[in-house]
Amino acid sequence: MTYKRVGSKRLAFCLSYFMLTAVSADVVTEDDLLADMHLVSSVTHMNQTLDKTPAAVTIIDRRTIQASAAVDVLDLFRLVPGFRAYYVNANFPGVTYHALGDDNPRRLEVKIDGRSVYESIFSSVEWTTLGIELDDIDYIEVVRGGNAPADGSNAFLASINIVTRSPLQEAGWKIHSQIGNDNIRNNAISYSGQLGAVQHRTVLRHSSNDGFEDFAGNYAGQFTQIALDDGADTTTFGFRGLWTPSAKDSIELQFGFNDSEVGIGDINYILRQIDYQYQHLNWSRINSDGSTFEFTSYHNKFDLSDQKDALTFYQALNFFPEGPLKESLAQLPDKLIIEPSHKAISERWDSEFRATFDHRHNVRAAYGAALRRDKVKSNMLFDMSDSSAENSSRVFAHFEWQMSDKLIANTGFLSESKDGGLPVGSYRMAVNYQLANNHTLRLGFNHGYRAPTLLESNQSTFVRYDENLILDGVVVSDSDIHAEKLISSELGYTGSLFNDQLHLDMRLFSEKMSDVIAERREQYPDFDGQLNIRDNTDSVTARGLEWQAQYRPSSQFLIHANYSFVDLTHSAFYRSTPVEQIRDLSGVNPKHLGSLLVNYVTNRELSLSAMLSHQSKIRHFSGNDDEGFTRLDVKAAKSWQLAGKDAEVALTIQNLGSDYRENYFYNQFSTRYVLSLKIGLL
């Protein structure tokens, strides 16, 4: 189903803004800007080459993005070893690393230009609200492994920083349109130019699709039909401005909004309306001695409304078993107990100061401090009409010591404090040894913590008749809930061969997670006799191997391959009363993940791509196993010059073969055809 709702006032503002800012600007070539493309900063907040970082890093650069057969951002993470990208619903995706991939994966930090998009209300990332497409991305830094010493609790398993294209990299107008089956309709218009001394890039985008096709087929031995109302309709506006008042200083301002309507649910679907907005300010200075200062501050606001079927008290009584309790409750007057609309608001304010110094006695360092305030409001999730807020702070420091020409040591720590709680500290140590030119071994140790989120530590979800009568207890947080713990070690290798044409990355890892937050069941005096308690219930151990390789013998040819093997042991404390029950969930993560991308660009600017992705079987405790899949995506794209501007037409075919299952049996990913057109205008 496709939902149609466009904010006319916002749309009018955006169109007016485009017309007012249409001025010419000089073009700076991409080669001028990407000289330091292989420098990464997400691991230590210092620019480092890949052979000096204390953790494994994957860079998805512009060339790889263009070569891929990806249609949206989610597809790109199939190119990263150990990363699993999946769909809970057609427009409700999830991404996780190695383990713990549920409907709301919440142990992965995701940033856009350094601004966290991790939302407090569901303790996860709402990918629908990101408001970016492949054309907006310059490159992506992915830290594979716990990155809490750099990014805090959200980066418990890994972290992602999506870096968008600078306003200096384009000039003038550009339109992009996509059409495809499942009623895919995506249209965008962007403008890069100058407002006084400010270089800017501004984008207006509208996207819609009908989601997965309705399910009709055999399930559990019988013919089943399910209507999937999981379409989406989204309008996005984004502005990025860059001002350089001096040779030392640069100031960047970003703001935008996203209006979405998305169908979500487990067989029974509801309509979720999302209004999302953000503001992001960054100031940086490069001093003459090579040291730097940086200050960044941002605000995210996530406002949602779930439209669902209302429920009256007498309707709820139909779910109660016959007996004296039901007869007694039937004497009470009828009333509405579940509203047809559930509203929730999540806000985050975050400010961080960061500084670096270089090469003092062969030591470089980065250090900083930050303040954060999270505020949420949801009567359904917190059983109160007032807002719930949490203040937190963090301090960090990272050091790189060049011990010799061949040996580098890295160490770093971060301490987080929240209202009324003890501080938790995460640290990492690593040594990198250069075996030979372009061949480096890395030995690393990581000790990280993930503090409970605002939802995890304060959830209280009940269905009430009134203040004194609870009909159903759903979820409540345990009063003694505390931080999750990760202890990991790794042996890594980075290297290059054939004059830097072939780049290799391998990682052997052991990751032990304890006090993992999930839900246990206990007896409760309500209609079903059960209450879910959010508590430290699970323990997870992951051991395995992952590698990636990219071969670029020329500017026309690219091969990218990756593979991961994860041996997972997952124990869950499922029920505490009346009898304790432990469940083995070791099969809920695929043991094998991998992908292969091959791209060739002819002399006539015809780009041909094939992308193969594989995921092995997932074994669910219920026995409803996901058999895994091997999926082939192909793309052909033709580029040319039109009146001195770039133009491109492309056809992408995803899953060239039989349908496969995405997460639930009724989510069948069929062959998808997407035709796109990009045109640069004067």
Would you name each region that the model predicts?
Residues 294-308, 374, 434, 442, ...:
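Membrane-embedded beta-barrel scaffold of Gram-negative outer-membrane proteins
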Residues 366, 402-408, 421, 509-512, ...:
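Gram-negative outer-membrane beta-barrel transporters
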